[in-house]
């Protein structure tokens, strides 16, 4: 069990009524809470959401607070400070004065910094500190009026192959405020991508998806991501750039296995972070299994750190892998099914 969940179980006497667990790890916590606690989970991680459903828990996969009332909330500190700001805001706009909010996180994950953010809503108390984790309690003294989701957007402009794109990114989304180096290295090659049905695996704020849709109005883009905030950001990016929704198919995925088949191309700056931890499972799975989702002569385009052994993985499963460029620490890799 996750050590943060162990802290919650150790201090379960503080819990009562309808309790919302926010960004909780996918473990046995919910099933081990006392039966008199009516626990629900709000997550934006699709793999965790599927895990909670399979375990019989009440779970919500969304970027917005669940549409019901709660007596308490437990916030598992996210990696992003901006995302925590958003979560605190929506919690304080849905819960009431004198209700309890708990904050739990790893010390290396910034729980002490997060506790300081909590202070602006009332008096806080540290309830537990063990297993490199801390648990804080807040009795709400100040609530907030809900702001529209759009007010949390960050936007920036990207110029590529004579196209200008406006990128919209919500809190917690990869490269929320600027174009990342890996995608910047990949973008000049997108005009070579085969037209048709194209999947953007790990779509993030929708930079790759938006370019491919704008480059050819007949392209159908399957924007795939594990994160609800990324999918919502991609939809907002398409809208901001005047691209019709008929070109976009948004799909939450746990990995490449959930992707459509018979695709003309898969393009990806693959994800490798899971919270504060590094996890290459999704990107390695993409290299190993992408061919199953492509038509004959379909294309795989990936940008990745040069130190990763993806060319070897791709060559093993495709029979070949071409390195299109090696620039600023990133390689653009190409293979044909």
Swiss-Prot record:
Keyword Cytoplasm set for record: yes
Gene Ontology CC: one annotated term: cytoplasm
Alphabetic keyword roster: Cytoplasm, Methyltransferase, rRNA processing, S-adenosyl-L-methionine, Transferase
Gene Ontology molecular function: any one: 16S rRNA (guanine(1207)-N(2))-methyltransferase activity
SUPFAM superfamilies: S-adenosyl-L-methionine-dependent methyltransferases (SSF53335)
Compartment(s): Cytoplasm
Main location (coarse class): cytoplasm
Entries under PANTHER family matching the protein: RIBOSOMAL RNA SMALL SUBUNIT METHYLTRANSFERASE C
Function: Specifically methylates the guanine in position 1207 of 16S rRNA in the 30S particle.
Protein name per Swiss-Prot or TrEMBL: Ribosomal RNA small subunit methyltransferase C
Gene: rsmC
